[in-house]
Amino acid sequence: PKETGKHPACQEMVFADIIINGPCVWTMREEKKIFGSPDDDENLLDIGLNRAVELIERDSGEHILFTESNSGLPVLLKNGRFGEYTEFDGFNKATKLPPEDKPKNPKVSYYDPHEMDYENAETKLFVLKSLRIIGFHPESNKPIGIKIRKPGKAFKFVKFIKCGEKEIECPNDFYKLEIDEQNSLIKEALSIDNFKTI
């Protein structure tokens, strides 16, 4: 394999390589190899880092929308078994497009990642809020937010304060609490004195 350089988002080396299935480019993400395939008329040896990254993002079903500035982590558009969603360090938000043939439902919060200008600071903030991000850890700069899980079919949704791998259950009425109360629950859950809010 030939090294083309480091992937800007995950800082892993990107390789150009020939495998059983033919020429490819690949890198590691979360301890898994992710691949991209050059177009038929491309010479593998001519592929530089930018093109390799483009091929990997195109073919691995992930697309970087923007890199969040506090954490340095990418906000990704992914395809999962339930369709398209936006993902950021374990927090996710499903794409929800308005219906084409009938009026929008005022109770539904539509979310279309293709209609957004990711150069715009307000858009980035809107995306982070949609992902339920509240702030950033004072030491690791990892995002802190609320993750909602459904433990089983019969159960209600359960809310967790999440930062990195750590998830601590929190009251279901978390969003109805005063901001000060929310913040003290977060500090207590993560054993921190303060954190940067978004």
Spans of features found by a protein language model:
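Basic, low-complexity terminal or inter-domain segments flanking catalytic cores
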Residues: 1-198
